[in-house]
Amino acid sequence: MRTATLYRYSVPMEAGVILRHQRLKSRDGLLVKLQQGELSGWGEIAPLPEFSQETLDQAQVAAECWLQHWVSGVESDDSVLPSVAFGLSCAQAELKQTLPLSADYRKAPLCTGDPDELFAVLQALPGEKVAKVKVGLYEAVRDGMIVNVLLEALPDLTLRLDANRSWSRAKADGFAKYVNPALRSRIAFLEEPCKTRAESREFAQDTGIAIAWDESVREADFQVEAEPGVAAIVIKPTLVGSLARCQQLVQQAHQAGLVAVISSSIESSLGLTQLARLAAWLTPATVPGLDTLDLMQAQVVRPWPDSPLPLITTEQLGVVWHR
């Protein structure tokens, strides 16, 4: 006997969470629960506005269609919508007990804004000091100066930077100009600095600052391959698709000598704990990019270890579909 339930959640965000062009006031998504006999499995379906190709309403329609088949005993292919494919594959993997329970709760702290705040966060980090800084929100020159100050002040720090394709080549060069060439090797990678892949490649080769592919990974013509100046690919499962697709990308990256980083698309605590398990399984040597829970005002169903945020339970969620 199979049953399935689809819940919808809405969690208020902290003030000041800005995506590409809009403020994100709440994080909205779906949780799916599959049940078969004594076993159950959960997954999260949460398209990220401005980044996902699908809307939440479109994802809900696709999920309901897939679940209708599943409860009838029909095994459907993965959804073509990445967030749906990811959430449903997680629920199936939990049900079949194929998603390992051990998790990598390390996170590269996400630093924005005040450099003084960054110092405090980074100096409190135990072990390997890896942090992520969003660049491209302010002036490129200012970003370069902040990165340089951080690397100078903390000699054991490695930074991951993310520009979200926000710079022209000239602005990217303006950033690099303010980062001491002797410190550039401690930039693990800069995600997609320029508006085109060609410009980003040239930037990496001209400046010695390694880059990573992020948005490119989700584009139809993208191939994982070793290239001069490219250090990593960033895999955001909500934007990429099923667990099998994520596994394929990680294997391709490792075969090409690239680092693969499992990264958050601002999922709820339930989705984040599953990403931590995925990271421990597929990329155990790499700190995942999962430091997004503190952008929210609550956790959902499953808590992240040691988080002080209140937990929303299943009883507090709206059921949008059940069979």
Curated annotation (Swiss-Prot):
Catalytic reactions of this protein: (1R,6R)-6-hydroxy-2-succinyl-cyclohexa-2,4-diene-1-carboxylate = 2-succinylbenzoate + H2O
Pathway(s) served: Quinol/quinone metabolism; 1,4-dihydroxy-2-naphthoate biosynthesis; 1,4-dihydroxy-2-naphthoate from chorismate: step 4/7; Quinol/quinone metabolism; menaquinone biosynthesis
Key word Ribosomal protein present: no
The protein, known as: o-succinylbenzoate synthase
Name of the gene this protein is made from: menC
A Gene Ontology BP annotation from the UniProt entry: menaquinone biosynthetic process
Family from the record: Belongs to the mandelate racemase/muconate lactonizing enzyme family. MenC type 1 subfamily.
Function: Converts 2-succinyl-6-hydroxy-2,4-cyclohexadiene-1-carboxylate (SHCHC) to 2-succinylbenzoate (OSB).
Gene3D superfamilies linked to this entry: Enolase-like C-terminal domain, Enolase-like, N-terminal domain
Required cofactor names: a divalent metal cation
Residues that, per the record, bind Mg(2+): D162, E191, D214
Signal peptide: none
Alphabetic keyword roster: Lyase, Magnesium, Menaquinone biosynthesis, Metal-binding
Enzyme class: lyase
InterPro entries (UniProt xref): Enolase-like_C_sf (IPR036849), Enolase-like_N (IPR029017), Enolase_C-like (IPR029065), Mandelate_racemase_C (IPR013342), OSB_synthase_MenC1 (IPR010196), OSBS_N (IPR041338)
Disulfide bonds: none
